[in-house]
Amino acid sequence: MTKIIEVKVEELNALPATKIVESENVQAKFVQMYNAIWGTDKGEQMYHKEVFNFQKLLRDNPDLADSTKMSLYGCFLDIAVNGLTLDQTGHPLCYILSRSSKTGHKNAQGYDIYEKRAYVSVTGYGELTMRMRAGQIKYADNPVVVYEGDHFKASLVNGIKNIEYEAQCPRTSTKVIAAFIRIVRNDNSVDYQWLMEGDIERLKHYSEKANSKWNDQTKRRELGKANALYTSNNGSIDPGFLENKMIKHAFDAYPKVRTGKFTIMDSDQEEEEIIDYGLVDEDKVNEPV
């Protein structure tokens, strides 16, 4: 019989942000969830590793530590749920970020009240790891960035996708014109996915919309600035940034993978199942906030 571990909201709120993960109940909940979800006994080992990574992230990003204690707690448990790591070396699998979110309450003037909440953002490489582990694919090659001057041809013949590619050596341009990735399914069939210049511009526009702000003078929302990485490569998109986008785009049409309640993935996901985070708030037991 599984032991019920309760984590009280008021106890979380009384702790400094970096100390949340050192709570005995938080440790027990992380280990319990990790072992149960992944069928292993390595939860204790992973807990200590991720405590170090979590606390380092908060020390390196003091602004992140101002997020609600509840959301920081949820993010830490999502590392167990997602089976990823916060280790930032090499190709990071995920980050912890923060954003302003509505609380559901209004102030005396009738305006929405916001608070800063942390969330886990899964990178393309993190999503690739999760999909391989879920058995959706056998493996995928590293994304290939195509530059002006390279030979590149994408085709679809009788329902079969194919790519012709040859890099120009020496390279004469740093302008990025496309990217593609080769995916091998579990039945050993091959799937190619690609992004052309028009697709990259579309993603850039989405970034502008995501950063839009309300203008009190014009009484309408106005487009914001796109992520600087869309133009940081001498006006072209950053190659590493595009590789990450390429992986995420490649799985748009694939089935969903399980993620934690405090996790966001760029590729579209259907509503996920509710996961017990062991929270106790007044009369509400084991209900994620």
Task: Give a label for each model feature.
Residues T18, E22, V26-R258:
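Binding-interface segments
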Residues M1-N35, K261-V289:
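Glycine- and charge-rich intrinsically disordered segments
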